Amino acid sequence: MKYLNKKEEEKAIIQILEVLLDNSVPFSGAHRKKQWEKGWGENLESGNITPKYFGKYPVQRFNGRLVKGCNEKQMLYSIVDSLAKKYLKQADIYEFGCGTGHNLWRVKAINKKAKLHGFDWTKSSQKIVNSMGFDGQNFDFFNPADIKLEKNAGVYTVASLEQTGTNYRKFVSYLLKNKPEVVVHIEPIPELLDSSKLLDYLSIQYMSKRKYLSGYLTYLEELEKKGKIKIIEARRSGIGSFLIDGYSIIIWKPIWKKQNN
């Protein structure tokens, strides 16, 4: 791994700015379901479960700096592995927005006894996940199905809840109803970045342009004040892709309240 020199960094920042000024860049939301179906369908057809967005750029982010010579996928897996070891020890573990299921393999390697469930809104994803021997089911963040989670389950998302933008409350309500033991997020969280720093500012602007998660941590903090959840961790991972510092970490759990007789 090497930090970019001044000339390389200036060139990279210009490239980021060009993306931010490009009006053809698509934004997230329910309208993009067909594109995700097509993308995961290509992975299904090829038999390769690595998402195509990995390796798109030779430059990544590390501790607030631009670097080269790193493998973004392996950097992300280091986060998934460490969080799985610490938090995902349950008998049933659910990934929401699992895509090709590549993160399910990582979690299964850590918790070999767990039953893994991969939920996604595309049929191609469910075919991939079921072919891997996991439980693949249809689930839409925007309109959560009434699928009951197993008791004391572990839940996680990796760069998938980002697609909901500001429409995440239905999903949170679904989780509060099902009361998993823990919820692990690896997602772009603008509240955790420092807008007074150039690369963070550009990352926040990219999140806004793509209409990624906005106000999610703030919403969770409001729920915590109301006594509905407990936030265990909320921090940056120090790892990101070229355009975005998108692998921040939030860990929370619902608070169980006994009913008065």
Regions found by a protein language model. Give the residues of each.
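Class I SAM-dependent methyltransferase SAM/SAH-binding core
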Residues: 100-143
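Conserved class I S-adenosyl-L-methionine
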Residues: 90-99
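A short glycine-rich, Lys/Arg-flanked "PGG" loop and its adjoining helix->strand segment in the class I
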Residues: 170-181
